[in-house]
Every structure is written in C-alpha cells, then in structure tokens.
Amino acid sequence: MTAPVGKDLERVRAEAQEAVRRLREQRPTLDDLSIDVILTNARSHYAWQDKPVSTELLHRLYEITAGGPTSMNTCPARFIFVTSDAGKQRLAKSLKAKNIDKMMDAPVTAIIAHDLEFWRDLPFLFPHEDRRPHFEGKPEHSETTAFRNGTLQGAYFMIAARALGLDVGAMSGFSNEIVDQEFFAGTTLKSNFLCNLGYADESALFQKLPRFPFDKVCSFA
C-alpha cells in the first residue's frame, strides 16, 4: 500500500475531516439507553440460551472492533472464534473447572490474542512512514505494545458485541500457556483473555456488584 502524497494527501485528509464533521452533526452523543446497553447497565454473563450466533454477525463484530484506535494503527489483536465441539474440547483443557461449563454452553468463545510481531504489517497499516525500526529487534517493547493495544481492542470487541445485541462474558480463569500451546504453537501469537458470546440466560444473574464513586478513584493534576 502506497501512502498518498501532495495533492492526493491533501484530498484524503480533507475527506477524513469532513466525514468527522458530518458524523458529529448527525448524532453528537449516544442516548442514555444506548450507554446503558454497552456499559452502565451491561452485565457479564455466564449462562446462555441455546441460540446460535451467525457468522455474518461475527464478521460485523470484527469490522466494528477494527475501527477502534491503536497506537500507530498497530492493530495487534487477533481473534479466534471457537464454535465447534472439537475446538471447545481443546479450549477446555486450559480452563479452571468452574469455567468449563460456562464456555461449553456459550455459542461462541473468542480467544483474544495479540501478535508479538505485529510490526511486520506496519507498511500496510501505517504506510506514510516506516515504523518497523521502532520494534524490530526490541522484543520487550514489541510485547508491551502488543499487549497494551491488543487489550484495548479486546475492550472495543466487548462493547461492539453489546452494541450488536450480543451478551458477553469475559474470562481470565484459564492457563494462557495451555491456550498458546493448543492454538498458537509455532506462531508469534499469545493469548490475553477469553470472551464468551451469545444470548444470555439472565435467570443465572445475581445483583450488579458495586463500583467506586468518582472521588474514590479520580483526581486532577
């Protein structure tokens, strides 16, 4: 991919700026119900209806997630949608016992991972300047960048899923080492967390747990 220059660069920048202006004019903020659905009153779910999630919806979920920002557009996250019985049996090897049924009953479990060598794709993702030297031969810096930005993308993924009418249940009660051996052996991918997707059975919920008030965790400098 070749980066635009000169008049072409001026044109694409002007188009991007105008697109933002139009979007702001159409709907500057989400309404309270939309915010409730994605965050304020959203819940983590661990029981599921016997209702499939279509492949088309998963494609749409990724497309929305991919629009979220990352440092230098690195986009290090990788998503494995575990839907088959065979795939779930493989994933079950990594889970703590109490989490196995939660995963097995979900229509989809996404493995949220990141590529430690994301920088190899920067000529495509960040074409106007070669940023590969920032990462090549610097594994600690690459890993920190991949983990941080992959985690951001995992959060975008959960919010996008809720916006599309799906329920989510993130899980960290598993062995990253076993997941990496089972699904990513011989690659540069590393698992971060798991996220069950589907249509929840809300009868398994308990009350929403408390959150800190602003003054407890926020300050000004």
Label the model's feature ranges:
Residues 65-67, 110, 129-182:
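Small-aliphatic-rich amphipathic alpha-helix that forms the alpha element of a beta-alpha
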Residues 96-98, 127-129, 185, 211-212:
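Short, solvent-exposed amphipathic alpha-helical segments in soluble enzyme
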Residues 90-92, 121-123, 181, 205-208:
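Short, well-ordered secondary-structure micro-motifs
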Residues 2-119, 220-221:
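N-terminal amphipathic, basic helical "cap/leader" segment at the start of enzyme domains
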